[in-house]
Swiss-Prot record:
One of its GO terms (cellular component) is glutamyl-tRNA(Gln) amidotransferase complex. Belongs to the amidase family. GatA subfamily. Heterotrimer of A, B and C subunits. The gene is gatA. This is Glutamyl-tRNA(Gln) amidotransferase subunit A. Keywords: ATP-binding, Ligase, Nucleotide-binding, Protein biosynthesis. InterPro entries: Amidase, Amidase_CS, Amidase_dom, AS_sf, GatA.
């Protein structure tokens, strides 16, 4: 039998339908792969008993011809999604052994469609990070290595566990979240596909909040088709989320393979940043050439406020985080560190419960919202955000179907290599991705090549609001031209 962990999600779905193997066999293969790859630290909680139980139930449904769109397919869930009866910590000590009595909307829709839970995936603490090094469970290791080196690399963040697990063949797909690039950057670092849908496309209910006006759930998978299949199950209106949009969910998979002839693809001049490696520039041109060869028209566009996006993002996101994280105080749930009085208990709990990066962002957020600085920082950042959104609107109004950019300014870097002395060095990793969140647009990262050391590099496509279908069509063109990327399993 084929190695079941090497299958794409679409291939596994078709194999189950053809009864080539059972969901239990598929699930057991992935559970064994997870056990063998613990050195990657991708999973923070494994749920083998629950997985096998769900797989058996799926097999019974498939036998009766009653299977859902994801029936029997084993997935990993980022530890930001509440899973009823299964520990959910956001990879923070402050949530300790918190076990929610409720299910997030996104995961409940995955279970509704028949998916199998393999366990919870590592992420940066409260999704704050670009390398998955801030987790209280320790850093995640990228399954990719530089040629001729055994140095451990980061998988990107904050959804590093999701990207690492998918790239290593530990699950067929994974949920992730994206506040400033946390789906697309890890996907680019690991040779996987990640899509951040339009803001409001997937419900945020039951997902631990970082920055509520920026957070959006999406999938990380091995192929564009797999991402499309997963997004269809994850998306949909939810009355429990006031920012959820009541709009029909299309058949995203049908867009994969659709012709892109005649589409206008914008190439934004502002994304040619100083110091960008020649390899990234060459990859960007290669991607544009592939789309042109498929019949698309390339046009240079201007997004003049791009240069202000990163500083504005690092004002807006911490401001929202400082408000959202005020609820963690040791009173009702999570960790509690006692003190001589209630105020000291709050202080002790938060000081010991939150990690250094989370504390830094809470402090930045509190500072920019304080009386003397609100107008100078937060209000200005929100005005910049409006201008960034307007840049995209004007671009799309000229008939541009999508915008092509690099996904990251570099390939994956070493664990402990960046941000130690200067956190801004780490924040610069988000330079190509934050504009998408600030404008609430959909963006997809697709593997497009490798650097001189053999590490995967990705390209990003940015779409019009609620036009994820065009991104899947264009993404598949790049995927077909570039081929698929698979990491060698050095950990076995």
């Amino acid at each position: 039998m084929t190695d079941l962990t090497s299958l794409t999600l679409a291939e596994a779905r078709d194999g189950l339908a053809a009864k080539s193997f059972s969901s239990l066999q598929l699930t057991d293969a992935h559970l064994a792969a997870i056990e063998a790859a613990r050195v990657l630290n991708a999973f923070v909680l494994e749920t083998p008993d629950q997985a096998r139980s769900m797989a058996k139930a799926a097999d019974a449904k498939i036998a009766k011809g009653e299977g859902g769109p994801l029936e029997g397919l084993p997935l990993g869930i980022k530890d930001l999604f509440a899973t009823s009866g299964v520990r959910t910590t956001a990879c923070s000590k402050i949530l300790d052994d918190f076990t929610p009595p409720y299910e997030s909307t996104v995961t409940s829709q995955l279970w509704r469609d028949g998916a199998v839970l393999l366990g919870k995936l590592n992420n940066d603490e409260f999704a704050m990070g670009s390398s998955n090094e801030t987790s209280c469970f320790g850093p995640v290791v990228n399954p990719w290595r530089r040629e001729g080196s055994d140095a451990k690399l980061v998988p990107g963040g904050s959804s590093g566990g999701s990207a690492s697990a998918v790239a290593a063949g530990l699950c067929l797909g994974a949920t992730a979240t994206d506040t400033g690039g946390s789906i697309r950057q890890p996907a680019a670092f690991t040779g996987t596909v990640g899509i951040k849908p339009t803001y409001g496309r997937c419900s945020r209910w039951g997902i631990v909040a970082f920055a509520s006006s920026l957070d959006q759930a999406g999938p990380i998978a091995r192929t564009v088709r797999d991402s499309a299949i997963l997004l269809r199950s994850m998306a949909g209106y939810d009355a429990k989320d006031t920012t959820s949009v009541d709009r029909a969910v299309p058949d995203y998979e049908a867009a994969v393979g659709r012709s892109v002839k005649g589409m206008k693809i914008g190439i934004p001049k502002e994304y040619r940043i100083g110091g960008m490696p020649a390899e990234i520039e060459a990859l960007w041109k290669q991607g544009a050439d592939w789309l042109k060869a498929a019949g698309a028209e390339l046009v240079e566009v201007s997004l003049p406020h791009t240069k202000y996006a990163l500083p504005a993002y690092y004002i807006v996101a911490p401001a929202e985080a400082s408000s959202n994280l005020a609820r963690y105080d040791g009173v009702r749930y999570g960790a509690r560190v006692n003190g001589r009085n209630i105020t000291e208990m709050y202080e002790n709990t938060r000081a010991q419960g939150f990690g250094a990066e989370v504390i830094r962002r809470i402090m930045i957020g509190t500072y920019v919202l304080s009386a003397g600085y609100y107008d100078a920082y937060y209000l200005r950042a929100q005005k910049v955000r409006t201008l960034i959104k307007r840049d995209f609107e004007e671009c799309f109004a000229k008939g541009v179907s999508a915008i092509l950019t690099p996904a990251t300014p570099s390939a994956a870097f070493g664990i402990g290599e960046k941000g130690g002395a200067d956190p801004v060095e780490m924040y610069l990793n988000d330079i190509f991705t934050v504009t998408v969140n600030m404008a609430g647009l959909p963006g997809i990262a697709v593997p497009a090549g490798r650097d001189s050391q053999g590490l995967p590099l990705g390209l990003q496509l940015i779409g019009r609001p609620f036009d994820e279908e065009t991104l899947f069509s264009l993404g598949e063109v790049i995927e077909q031209a570039a081929g698929r990327f698979t990491a060698a399993k050095w950990w076995i």
